[in-house]
């Protein structure tokens, strides 16, 4: 639609150059989610082409499912959360929680986006993402940061934990 950047052209260029592509989505309208089109059209309202009750509103009559197909797809209840999970995994692998954003940053981003007209999936101008209010959004970010921080604190312990368990006679 006219509201969105035409970033799918970049996606197509990456595929032409054999650069692996990756998509994160929740409803199938996210770039790259066309890779699982059959599943999306079966389970997601408005994804199918043609039928009046199930088409997108841009005028193409093609349904909301993205045209582009990624090589790898990650689905999440809230696509933002899938993105945060990928960032959390990278932060763990790099040993640096500063690679993740904070609950305060989440609040600022959502507030700023809302101030400039971002609507929720329900069409509401609210401080929420996919129906999840600010307290939930901030809690998810906080929980992911805590999980990574905790896991990083156990890296050395986990190198030998199973040895100690066997030494004590378990699983023997």
Please tell me what each predicted stretch does:
Residues 15-21:
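A short helix->loop->beta-strand "cap" motif at the edges of active sites that frequently abuts
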Residues 23-25, 29-41:
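Glycine-rich, charge-decorated loop segments at or immediately adjacent to ligand/cofactor-binding or catalytic sites
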Residues 1-12:
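Active-site glycine-rich loop that binds ribose-phosphate moieties when present
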Residues 10-15, 90:
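Hydrophobic, Leu/Ile/Phe/Ala-enriched alpha-helical segments that form helix-helix packing faces
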Residues 77-80, 96-172:
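C-terminal accessory domains and tails appended to enzymatic cores
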Residues 1, 15, 43:
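Phosphate-rich cofactor/ligand-interacting catalytic cores and adjacent structured alpha/beta frameworks
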Residues 42-106:
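A conserved mid-domain beta-alpha-beta active-site/ligand-binding segment of alpha/beta enzyme cores
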């Amino acid at each position: 639609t006219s509201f969105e950047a035409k970033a799918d052209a970049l996606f197509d260029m990456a595929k032409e150059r054999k650069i692996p592509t990756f998509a994160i989505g929740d409803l199938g309208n996210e770039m790259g989610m066309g890779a699982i089109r059959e599943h999306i059209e079966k389970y997601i309202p408005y994804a199918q082409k043609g039928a009046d009750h199930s088409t997108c509103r841009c005028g193409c009559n093609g349904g909301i499912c993205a045209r582009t197909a990624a090589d790898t797809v990650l689905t999440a209840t809230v696509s933002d959360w899938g993105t945060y999970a990928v960032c959390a995994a990278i932060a763990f692998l790099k040993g640096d929680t500063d690679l993740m954003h904070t609950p305060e940053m989440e609040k600022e981003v959502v507030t700023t986006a809302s101030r400039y007209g971002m609507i929720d999936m329900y069409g509401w101008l609210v401080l929420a993402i996919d129906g999840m209010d600010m307290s939930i959004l901030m809690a998810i970010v906080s929980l992911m940061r805590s999980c990574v921080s905790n896991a990083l604190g156990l890296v050395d312990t986990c190198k030998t934990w199973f040895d100690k368990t066997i030494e004590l006679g378990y699983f023997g």
